[in-house]
Amino acid sequence: MKQLIDKLQTALSGIYEGHELTAIIRTICCDMLGIDTATYYLKEAVTLTTEQGTLLQGIIDRLRQGEPLQYIEGKAPFCGMEFAVNSSVLIPRPETAELVDWIVCEHATQHPRILDLGTGSGCIAIALSKQLPQATIEACDISAEALT
């Protein structure tokens, strides 16, 4: 695992730093190897297949070109769920999760009607519907690419 981590650190340092670099490396390794975070920290030896090595180089190249990891992987976490994302939608941000939490706290005992215009990945509408089952929520987007 150390060789894989070192390769990623060498390839991506200068583009990413500190905690962000550590998180990106951990995410790439866990997703590529199909392991959880605990296994990532405990696993010592890793041998990549030729296909995994090619995939890894492609990920590195795209990251070096400034493409967000979430777009490369096609997914992003939000409010304890995972959402499909592509370049047609905004990547869900922690600040948006705070907005969802605030709406839930403010309307926990009510039956709100919520309209999510420009929903993109649908993460806000879906997170709100999970946490406010009594709410009526409608979401739409003009972009067919965003909704697929």
What is the role of each PLM region?
Residues 1-73:
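N-terminal auxiliary segments of SAM/dcSAM-dependent transferases
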Residues 44, 58-132, 137-148:
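SAM-dependent Rossmann-like transferase core, predominantly class I methyltransferases
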